Amino acid sequence: MASSSGNDDDLTIPRAAINKMIKETLPNVRVANDARELVVNCCTEFIHLISSEANEICNKSEKKTISPEHVIQALESLGFGSYISEVKEVLQECKTVALKRRKASSRLENLGIPEEELLRQQQELFAKARQQQAELAQQEWLQMQQAAQQAQLAAASASASTQAGSSQDEEDDDDI
């Protein structure tokens, strides 16, 4: 891994993750960029070594998918047996987190109401909302019609009073 081509960058751990790990592990220590790069390269090489060994173990057991057990066996066969207890703890934590995520995403399924019933209830709610909207529109229409009728009556009343006032003026003119 001496070369630093674009493909090698795809196969490394993100530097931000390494920097975070270094800060958490050694909070009061300054680490040179060369040392950080060395840690990235060591981590990458370690992952390649373990994954290659786990792949061989997987192939020997005639499986197509590398399982956590294959990784644990690879650690043991490469002399990293002292890491196995921590690896198992982390594996259990990952399983717990994944289970919580699945439970959270399956809340709908855990309601105990069949999907067909939920869809029926949803359609019923939509129908009620459409009915309420139609009733509101009808009320608005009736209010507009009443307002228009009142405006017409007011205009007719004003016109009638204007005509009555002008005919009263004509009668007053006749008296002179």
From Swiss-Prot:
Keywords assigned = Acetylation, DNA-binding, Nucleus, Phosphoprotein, Repressor, Transcription, Transcription regulation
Q: Quick one: where is this thing mainly located?
A: nucleus
Q: Which residues carry this modification: Phosphoserine?
A: S105, S106, S166, S167
GO terms, biological process: negative regulation of transcription by RNA polymerase II; regulation of cell cycle; regulation of cell division; regulation of DNA-templated transcription; regulation of embryonic development; regulation of transcription by RNA polymerase II
**Modified positions (N-acetylalanine) in chain numbering:** A2
SUPFAM superfamilies in the record: Histone-fold
A Pfam family it matches = CBFD_NFYB_HMF
Subcellular location per UniProt equals: Nucleus
Under InterPro entries, the record lists:
CBFA_NFYB_domain (IPR003958), Histone-fold (IPR009072), Ncb2 (IPR042225)
What is one term from the GO cellular component aspect held by the record?
RNA polymerase II transcription regulator complex
Biased composition of type Low complexity is found at 152-167
- The record places domain Histone-fold at 12-75
Modifications made to the protein after synthesis: Phosphorylation regulates its interaction with TBP. Not phosphorylated when bound to DRAP1.
A molecular function (GO) term: DNA binding
Q: Does the keyword Methyltransferase apply?
A: no
- Entry similarity comment: Belongs to the NC2 beta/DR1 family.
Quaternary structure, per UniProt, is:
Heterodimer with DRAP1. DR1 exists in solution as a homotetramer that dissociates during interaction with TBP and then, after complexing with TBP, reassociates at a slow rate, to reconstitute the tetramer. Interacts with NFIL3. Component of the ADA2A-containing complex (ATAC), composed of KAT14, KAT2A, TADA2L, TADA3L, ZZ3, MBIP, WDR5, YEATS2, CCDC101 and DR1.
Q: Its function?
A: The association of the DR1/DRAP1 heterodimer with TBP results in a functional repression of both activated and basal transcription of class II genes. This interaction precludes the formation of a transcription-competent complex by inhibiting the association of TFIIA and/or TFIIB with TBP. Can bind to DNA on its own. Component of the ATAC complex, a complex with histone acetyltransferase activity on histones H3 and H4.
Question: What is the designated name of this protein?
Answer: Protein Dr1
